[in-house]
Each structure stands twice: as structure tokens, then as C-alpha cells.
Amino acid sequence: MAHSHTSSHLPEDNNARRLLYAFGVTAGFMLVEVIGGFLSGSLALLADAGHMLTDTAALLFALLAVQFSRRPPTIRHTFGWLRLTTLAAFVNAIALVVITILIVWEAIERFRTPRPVEGGMMMAIAVAGLLANILSFWLLHHGSEEKNLNVRAAALHVLGDLLGSVGAIIAALIIIWTGWTPADPILSILVSLLVLRSAWRLLKDSVNELLEGAPVSLDIAELKRRMCREIPEVRNVHHVHVWMVGEKPVMTLHVQVIPPHDHDALLDQIQHYLMDHYQIEHATIQMEYQPCHGPDCHLNEGVSGHSHHHH
């Protein structure tokens, strides 16, 4: 069995710095919105603070991923500590679902018994929240040519949260102009649905990763077909297992090949193929000269299992 590795590049310091600044801005204004929501009586502000919590958590996980990716693996933790960010994402997703349910429940109560809402204060805080989101987005997007995945994902989170702040501003304007307070719980429910969408996606992705599911973006049947088609010596690919450790995909696979003139060169070619086409830096490849026999040979097999090249 042959083990192939390539050294992964550590995240740049300015990625971590940008994440840290954006985290500070977002977390700070989230607290302002929570306090403002209670003082003004606005549920829409509290819902937007819940939405900001999704951003704060996304930024925190991105920061943790940067930190943990720098910590070397140990004898006990051979993959390092990257899975901790997945566990944190799972806990965060559940917390967000609970927060959303509580806000929707409170919104329904407010339809039955409306409460006064301080429109002016609500407006001021919602505008400040919008500016904070714009600042966070600029911090993350500015100089993103390094294309760090964590930073790009966090920027998308913040962009989504702009909608929450806009919603709170609309509710505040309606209350200031018309005094119609039901605008507040209506907008808070709409913002809660945005939070629930983010939370559901986070929950689904983190559960898939914790259960060692293959990355959603990777089509294993297509990978097997392409390897058989594009590497002439490869006749069959089977026993493919792919899972994620943090952001890094890890793969093991068996490859039936025509006996090569240079075993190591072919191994190197397969390794580089996986890295160039699928960004898989860590693959354990078992090369075989005989067809696979046994009940597990057709595991995760599409049509690819029967692709052969005749030479």
C-alpha cells in the first residue's frame, strides 16, 4: 500500500487578522442589538441579533480553523484538531434553531397582545447594525485575492445578514410613520426564517461531516469514470472512501492498473491527478494488478465500476 502526501499551505496571517477584526465588529454590534432590542421593545432587532449570531459563529469557526490548522497532529490526534470546528458548528446550529423558535413564539404572542415599540431607538440601532455589517463585509472582502475558503464563506454570511438589518429598518420606518406595531413581529418572523435557513444548512453540513459522509460537492461515480478515462493505465477504481477533516478532504482508494514500467511514477501521477482535479492533498492509494473480487467491490459503484481500457 502506498501513502501519498503533499504539504498543505498554512493560512496567511492577514486572513486571520481580517477574520479577527470582522469578528470584533460583528460580535460588538450583536450585543448592541440585543440591548437595543430589549430597551426599545423591538423583536425585529432581537431577531437580527440572532442573525448576527450566525455571522459571529461563522467568523469564530473560521478563526478556529485557521488556528487549529497550524497545530501539528499528535500521536493521539493524527489528523490534528480540525474536527473541533465541525463539532462547534453542530452545537451552534442547534442553538440557532432554539433561538429562532423562541423568537417566532414571542412574535406570535405579540400579535395577540401588542406591546409598545420605541421606533426611533429601533431605527438608530438598525442603521448602526447595517453599517457594522457593511464594515465587516469590507474587512473580509478587501484583499480576498488569497481566496481563503473560510474568509469567503464568512463574507457570504455577513452579506446575508444585511437583509436582517434592512428588515429591522423597514419595520422601524413603518412604526415611526404609522405607529403600526405589528410590523415588528412580522419582520422578526421573516428574519427568523433567514436564520433558520442558515442554521439548517449548518446543521446538515456538520452532521454529514461528523458522520464522515463524503463531501456533497464530490461525485464519486464521476471521479471513478474520469480516472479510468483520463489515466490510460487505470482499468478500475473501487473501495473509494472520502471524508472531511475540517476543510481538508481525505481519501482512500484501490486502483486496478496495467502493471506499469515505473510503479512510483504512476502512483505520483494518480496522486497529482486527485490533487489537481479534486483538491485532495491526502490520499492513500492501493494499486492492484488483478480485478477486485468480493461483495464490497461494487460499493459506491455507478457505471464506473465496469469501465475498462483494452490495450
UniProtKB/Swiss-Prot annotation:
Signal peptide (residue range): none
Record field: transmembrane: 19-39, 46-66, 88-108, 120-140, 158-178, 180-200
GO molecular function: zinc ion transmembrane transporter activity
Cell compartment(s), UniProt: Cell inner membrane
Its membrane topology: Multi-pass membrane protein
Pfam families assigned: Cation_efflux
Stretches assigned to the Periplasmic side: 40-45, 109-119, 179
GO cellular component, as recorded: plasma membrane
Function: Involved in zinc efflux across the cytoplasmic membrane, thus reducing zinc accumulation in the cytoplasm and rendering bacteria more resistant to zinc. It may contribute to zinc homeostasis at low concentrations of zinc.
Keywords: Cell inner membrane, Cell membrane, Ion transport, Membrane, Transmembrane, Transmembrane helix, Transport, Zinc, Zinc transport
Cytoplasmic side: 1-18, 67-87, 141-157, 201-311
Family annotation (Gene3D superfamilies): Cation efflux protein transmembrane domain, Cation efflux protein, cytoplasmic domain
Main location: membrane
Protein name as it appears in the record: Zinc transporter ZitB
Family to which this protein belongs: Belongs to the cation diffusion facilitator (CDF) transporter (TC 2.A.4) family. SLC30A subfamily.
Domain of life per record: Bacteria
